[in-house]
Each structure stands twice: as C-alpha cells, then as structure tokens.
Amino acid sequence: MAVISMKQLLEAGVHFGHQTRRWNPKMAKYIFTERNGIYIIDLQKTVKKVDEAYNFIREVASEGGNVLFVGTKKQAQDTVKEEAIRAGQYFINERWLGGTLTNFSTIKKRINRLKQLEKMEENGTFEVLPKKEVIILKKEMTRLEKFLGGIKDMPGVPDALFIVDPRKERIAIAEAHKLNIPIVAIVDTNCDPDEIDYVIPANDDAIRAVKLLTGKMADAILEVKQGEDNVAPETTEEVVADAE
C-alpha cells in the first residue's frame, strides 16, 4: 500500500504547480496537464516518488544515519522545525550559512560557542558580569541559536538532506553534491530535478502540501525508531542460554 493517498495529496493542494511561464522543461515528465495558466502535477507519479523517498529515508534511519531537514522559505520554516524535532533529527530553517557541510569544523566552533554561552546563562555567570557585557553576550547567543539551534546536537555531517524548494536552497545542494550526500526534495515545476537524488514532484508553496510531505519523511524515521523501541531486550537467562 502507498505511503500516501491521491486523496490526501489532492486535499493538500500538492498538484498545483507554478505558472506555465515559470517552469523548468526538465519537469515535463511530472506534469499532468495545464489549467488556467498553471501546471498541474501528475499525482500518480508523486505517490510513487513519495514511496521511493520514504523507503530511502527509512533505510538511512535504520542504519543509524542522520537526516538534516532544510527549508528556509516562509511556508516551510515552522514545518521543517516541527517535523525534524518530532523525528529526533536536525534542521535549518533560517539562512543557510555557507560551509555548514563543507566546512563543518568551523561551524562546530560556532556551535561550541553557543553551548558555552548557554552554560554561562544556566550556571549564573551572567548574573555576576556587568550588565552591558551580558546584553552583548545574550545578543550573540540569540543570533547563534537562530542560525545553529537546529544543528547544535548534530554529531557530524548528515547522511542525507531533505529539502523544501531546491531553487531556494542552492548553497545547501552545492555543498551536499561536493560531499556526495544524497538529497530528497520537494520539487516544484520551476525546479531542476536532475540535481536531486529522490525527487518528490509537488507544490512547494502551499503550507499544507509542505506539511503533509515533510511529515511523511519524519514518519519514515519514526517507523524505524518505534520498531527499535518495540524490540524486547534480551533477558540475562536468554543470554546465558545462548552462550551455552
């Protein structure tokens, strides 16, 4: 059975592409028809592609890999954060900082600085420092949290990227390509599908569409995690019996 139904996709408006004058000819194979100057995406293909993406993300999770959710456009920011957190993964929903993947060691230094400032706030250091200095430090902490909060616990470069709107996330895609990190993405009719390993042809501007598809990718990770939670731990007796 498909991960997602045609009915769910229709209700979320996943089928609405961009205006016909704003399109990438490489997306032609995913277009069903044109209506009132707007391309309509072939949802039968979307259903199939969601299945492929879901299975890939599930595979990454089953091997203990990490997925970085990326969506900095307004319609994606809240969803990307919520779904990544729900799946116990990482996210970037503000500006992508150049070098986030290709220069992760430098980014890690900024993350360590953020953690240092958080610790200073927690252990009361801010209370004994001059007021002016505290204002400057808090400002720095807020800025670092804004851009790096979603990846501050990410142990290293992720094993896969999930992206909402590849046109918006050009730098993220270029960095992932350099490091051979596979990309899953919601790809609208104005995008280049050749840049993406797992294309999900869909409307990337409607909040409901973004939420539905991003939620399914989070579900793939949770399916693995819940499966692990349901595996009963071996008892001491079983371990001893196996040894004998």
UniProtKB/Swiss-Prot annotation:
- Superkingdom per UniProt: Bacteria
PROSITE patterns from the entry? RIBOSOMAL_S2_1 (PS00962), RIBOSOMAL_S2_2 (PS00963)
Any one Gene Ontology cellular component term annotated for this protein:
cytosolic small ribosomal subunit
Molecular function (GO) terms for this protein are:
structural constituent of ribosome
For this protein, the record's InterPro entries field holds: Ribosomal_uS2, Ribosomal_uS2_bac/mit/plastid, Ribosomal_uS2_CS, Ribosomal_uS2_flav_dom_sf
What are the alphabetically sorted keywords of the record?
A: Ribonucleoprotein, Ribosomal protein
BP terms from Gene Ontology: translation
**One Pfam family from the UniProt entry?**
Ribosomal_S2
The text of the family note is: Belongs to the universal ribosomal protein uS2 family.
State the protein's name: Small ribosomal subunit protein uS2
Species name for this entry? Exiguobacterium sibiricum (strain DSM 17290 / CCUG 55495 / CIP 109462 / JCM 13490 / 255-15)
